[in-house]
């Protein structure tokens, strides 16, 4: 049976933390900042943890991710 392939789009978007959770960055951070408040831009800077409902699906895409 052939090896499973890592989903490259997901591999670029998620990092695994030391405790095994998945870290992601926020959307809406590439352009159009003039009409976003300073508070919104500040909150978008921080990374977020993937919710448990999505975790299993994403983990299957990242088969060999350390």
From Swiss-Prot:
Annotated region (Disordered), positions in chain: 1-48
Leader sequence residues: none
Any GO molecular function: structural constituent of ribosome
Pfam families to which the protein is assigned, alphabetical: Ribosomal_L35p
Matches recorded under Gene3D superfamilies: 4.10.410.60
Family: Belongs to the bacterial ribosomal protein bL35 family.
Name of the protein this chain belongs to: Large ribosomal subunit protein bL35
Organism name: Halalkalibacterium halodurans (strain ATCC BAA-125 / DSM 18197 / FERM 7344 / JCM 9153 / C-125) (Bacillus halodurans)
Lineage: Bacteria, Bacillati, Bacillota, Bacilli, Bacillales
